[in-house]
């Protein structure tokens, strides 16, 4: 149940709502789909970041595609062995609104953490240019519709594989593997 709408607008890419609710606290909603909230964001961000960073033997260079709320970046810069985190999000408005309405999530961006570089741009195009560079790539994106659709394509996964170092790890928010079997197959086919 929403108690207050703090922001309702439209960026170049999507509809954006920031609202308060009794159950989840402040929430970010993109194109009508819940993305994150103050009260439970840690479960998602800690899982998508810490698991691959603890599994990799030496994760120095991390790339985050998406992640405009800043939560994945906040968690990645906490690892002492990580030297650099590059975050590329297509929607600069989500980044700015997150800094304003979700300062505890976007802490690393707000504090200009020296390990973090934030780029507003197309993550698909960015990935095409990288080769054998990243130890860990995290794709923290919305569902496979709208601006996130291309992040679930076979070509994107091929480019991701090329951008990883030989021992690199890749993690992506992919919805349920039972509901999206083709997506899981495309990932493993790369």
Segments predicted by a language model, with ranges:
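N-terminal auxiliary segments of SAM/dcSAM-dependent transferases
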Residues: 1-27
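The AdoMet/dcAdoMet-binding core of the Class I SAM-like
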Residues: 36-187
């Amino acid at each position: 149940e929403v108690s207050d709408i703090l922001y309702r607008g439209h960026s170049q890419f999507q509809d954006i709502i920031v609202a308060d609710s009794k159950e989840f606290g402040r929430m970010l909603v993109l194109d009508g789909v819940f993305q994150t909230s103050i009260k439970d964001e840690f479960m998602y961000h800690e899982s998508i970041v810490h698991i691959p960073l603890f599994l990799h033997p030496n994760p120095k260079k991390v790339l985050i595609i998406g992640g405009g709320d800043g939560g994945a970046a906040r968690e990645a810069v906490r690892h002492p062995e990580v030297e650099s985190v590059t975050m590329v999000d297509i929607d600069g408005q989500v980044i700015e609104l997150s800094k304003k309405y979700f300062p505890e999530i976007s802490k690393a961006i707000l504090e200009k953490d020296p390990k973090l570089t934030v780029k507003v741009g197309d993550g698909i195009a960015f990935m095409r240019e990288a080769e054998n560079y990243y130890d860990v790539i995290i794709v923290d994106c919305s569902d496979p519709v709208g601006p996130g659709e291309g992040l679930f394509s076979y070509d994107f996964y091929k480019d991701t594989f090329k951008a990883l170092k030989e021992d690199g790890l890749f993690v992506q928010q992919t919805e349920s593997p039972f509901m999206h079997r083709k997506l899981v197959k495309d990932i493993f086919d790369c």
